[in-house]
Design a protein with these regions (language model features):
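Intrinsically disordered, low-complexity segments enriched in serine/proline and basic residues
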Residues: 1-6, 13
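Conserved N-terminal/central alpha/beta ligand/cofactor-binding core
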Residues: 9, 23-30, 56, 62-63, ...
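Beta1/beta-strand and adjacent pyrophosphate-binding region of the FAD-binding site
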Residues: 35-47
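Core beta-strand elements of the Rossmann-like FAD/NAD(P) dinucleotide-binding domain
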Residues: 37-39, 175-184
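Short hydrophobic core segments
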Residues: 44, 180-191
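N-terminal Rossmann-fold NAD(P) dinucleotide-binding loop
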Residues: 50
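Conserved beta-strand-loop-beta-strand element in the redox core of flavoprotein oxidoreductases
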Residues: 160-179
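Rossmann-like dinucleotide-binding core of oxidoreductases
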Residues: 194-276
Length: 276
């Protein structure tokens, strides 16, 4: 069979040349204009850790910049998830052991009146279920009230170093490449982006041992909540086992689901994808 020639777009070729040692692209990045004056703290990533870091630094009087690649704050907690765990101890009688900024976030969510506190299916303590859009608003309100400068739709492309110290990050924005300079940088990207670009020690998932596949969940609509409440976890797992034994291809025979802040909508954690 004859091989087909594949035409690679010029934009991709340009990136490949740069990655292969062509310095032209890198020089263009280093010469990118400053997005704002020097910050005391620059945080990359606005998930729970990044937004908390930015908020804590700003409350201590630092001039803080928060960079987020999405068009909203919150990272995975607003893009995918709907429940906080870790505020309470495991067991039947949960004790609250986390406060601080976590409390501030939950208090702000409660003002929006769509918060459900519920027990974990496996006894891991109370969970705090929220509406993702409410959490987007809560984080935005809190960081702006603290005086944090927020830049959305910013993707880190590189860093500028001086004697192994990060001086600025190069970001791709809607207006093109730009630099953000700071005295201290916090990598809350979730992917160790700053570590990678700066050459700092880091671990690549799956390089030395199997990496767990990302958790894949889905939501079910039009669920009869009263009927669902009558079905306990033991019955659910038993039904899944019987279905698998009858020939239904189920990669996982246990799991859980929970009510959300929207009537008739339940979230599940019941799928499994083989690690590779």
């Amino acid at each position: 069979m004859a091989r087909r020639a594949i035409r690679i777009p010029s934009e991709i070729l340009q990136v490949l040349r740069w990655l292969n040692g062509n310095t032209t692209g890198r020089l263009a990045m280093i010469n990118a204009p400053m997005l704002a004056p020097l910050f005391d703290v620059v945080v990359v990533g606005s998930g729970s850790s990044g937004a908390s870091a930015a908020l804590a630094a700003a409350r201590e009087g630092a001039k803080v910049c928060l960079l987020e690649r999405s068009s909203f704050l919150g990272g995975t907690s607003t893009a995918v998830l709907d429940t906080f765990y870790g505020f309470y101890t495991p067991g039947v009688h949960s004790l609250k052991v986390v406060g601080g900024i976590g409390d501030d976030v939950v208090d702000r969510l409660k003002k929006l009146d769509r918060v459900v506190e519920r027990p974990n299916s496996y006894g891991a303590g109370l969970g705090i279920t929220y509406h993702p859009d409410d959490l987007k608003c809560a984080w935005e309100q809190l960081v702006l009230e603290a005086g944090v400068t927020v830049f959305l739709n910013c993707w880190v492309q590189d860093v500028q170093l001086d004697s192994d110290c990060i001086m600025s990050v190069i970001v791709a924005t809607k207006r093109g490449l730009a630099q953000v300079a700071g005295r201290t940088f916090v990598d809350a990207s979730g992917d160790a982006d700053l570590c990678f670009w700066s050459g700092s020690p880091h671990v690549t998932a799956g390089e030395h041992e199997e990496a767990q596949s990302l958790t894949t969940t889905f939501r079910m609509c039009n669920v009869d909540a009263i009927t669902r409440k009558a079905v306990d976890l033991e019955y659910l797992h038993s039904a899944m086992t019987k279905a698998a034994e009858a020939g239904y291809a189920l990669p996982r025979r246990e799991g859980s689901d929970h009510a959300t802040t929207v009537d008739g909508v339940f979230a599940t954690n019941i799928t499994r994808i083989q690690s590779f």
